[in-house]
Amino acid sequence: MALLLPEFDPADVRAGRDLIHRLTADAAGIQRGVLREILSRNSGTEYLRRFLGGAAGDDDDVRDAFKRRVPVSGYEDVKPYVDRVASGGEPSSALLCSDPITCLSRSSGTSGGQQKLLPSTAEELDRKVFFYAVQALVRNMSLHTDHGEDDDGGGGEGMYLMFAFHGDRTLSGLPIQSALTTYYHSRQFQECDIGGFDKCTSPLEAILCPYGEQSMYCQLLCGLLHRCRVDRVGASFAAGLVRGIKFLENHWEEMCFNIRSGQLSDWITHTPLRDAVTGQYLQGSNPALADEIASECARKPWDGIVRRLWPRARYIRTIVTGSMSQYIPILEVYGGGLPLVSPIYASTECAAGINLRPLDPPSHVSYALLPNIAYFEFLEVMDENGEKVQGTTRLDDNLGEVKVVDLVDVKVGRCYELIVTTFAGLYRYRVGDLFTVSGFYNATPLFHFSGRHDVILSIDYEKISEEDLLNAIAETDKFHLRPLGYMLVGSTAYADISTLPGHYILFWELTNTCDSNVAIDIDQTAMEKCCLAVEDHFDEMYRKIRHRGSISALEIRILSHGAFDALMDFFVSRGTSASQYKTPTAIRSKEAMMVLEERVVGRFFSQATPSCRSAEFERR
């Protein structure tokens, strides 16, 4: 265990550089060791015995047997075992992994549309500690270099929004909750500086508060009270940070009253939270600070509000890759030029990706998968020419003889789907996340997160990937919305087949950049141009089908203020963790669509068909 998860001090930058070099220079050797350790521990489990029997021999023999006999799997392969673990009728250590399963981690369900319960063990918390320690090390190496080689940058604090909510329990008493909630409640997290190797303005009682609105209010209030100490601002995901800023916009006057009077609002009723805020932060009236904050918040628009409220802030730290990329423009406005740092790639299956060049612009962010966290394989999805590899387009595909390659054998420019084998009992498991290889750091590949396999829009033969949709929206936002003074706050899509032919619907919430108010009175011609611009960015197959009339015109529906907050509340009410929530790029649930439909204030359609080369050829 110590060899795979070496202890180190994230504040010791010199030693940290050596650690990262060792991890990335010998990725192949470390990966062999990880697989050897996983198989030696778990070969007696029911799942592996089905395929490996009593496979023995040297490392190469066992590795070859693993690759030949253990099939690539998906959630439906694992679910029967998870159900048996949940029922508690037999020892969990006999089913998937030799260590007792201590928790079932619940995925958000907003990426692929399906919530999943995945096994986790006590040891997984140690891996998370190592993972976040490496993240802190990279931060100290790249973002706080002026503090010196052996200084932890301790002069500043992070104003991070973090939330842990109580989950459910299985019949056998196992907790069911998000991976982040498990981590925040753990001894490992609470024994570190609050924030996990990261001094944070939020008291632990705010992070663990079960009431989301009270938690959000007090975390922002504490961040304002410590505004002169804050040198970084963030949240796990960009959607959560934008939500926090909009919350602040609606509550800053009340917070200023709290600061001016030294009294916390009566509606903060959670006793541990109230005691922590009044005992540690709000210890008397401070009219001068209240006036400073009010002066900045009263200025409209809110361009640069993060930099203005936290003048020492060096950067914004939040995940802005994948579906979160839609929030880059609005965060750039709120940040007023602060760099957007997308620090990690993490999924419920495993947290493993570190951004080793955190100051790269968001569009160029790449992650290195730490080779000691899990065993990684990759299923090729596209070659370097952008051509799809047959048989790998859906999670339920029969892979046949399609080749799966190891971490160090991927090729630059090619797109792959991530497959993981974990200590906690996932074997050759398809995560559903797509990565394009952008280069190498020593012997370890760097991956650009390209989206998900199973988040697509499709009505006829066309298939719109998450990346296709996000790129189309980003270009339309850049060239059609922002020049008119509009800013996209939230977006999701829905394939509507309630009428024939079906069509795509984009739900957008906009603000006016001049005063930060909700944009409702919008020019019809401008929005019709946006509809066509999105369609023009879709692929040739979509445009061909549009010309044939098998899909009707794309529609944009403009939403009232708070619509995407309501969508989050809908998903949270159905078990999604608020801390892991990501606004879905596309929704499939009719119920979720109706949450947005109730808040529609404008409807616009393409008034022309998108350009199509093949249609022009057919007319000739």
UniProtKB/Swiss-Prot annotation:
UniProt KW Ligase keyword: yes
E.C. designation(s): 6.3.2.-
UniProt KW keywords: Ligase
EC class (word): ligase
Induction (UniProt): At low level by auxin.
Protein name: Probable indole-3-acetic acid-amido synthetase GH3.7
Species whose genome carries this gene: Oryza sativa subsp. japonica
Taxonomic path: Eukaryota, Viridiplantae, Streptophyta, Embryophyta, Tracheophyta
Gene (name only): GH3.7
Protein function: May catalyze the synthesis of indole-3-acetic acid (IAA)-amino acid conjugates, providing a mechanism for the plant to cope with the presence of excess auxin.
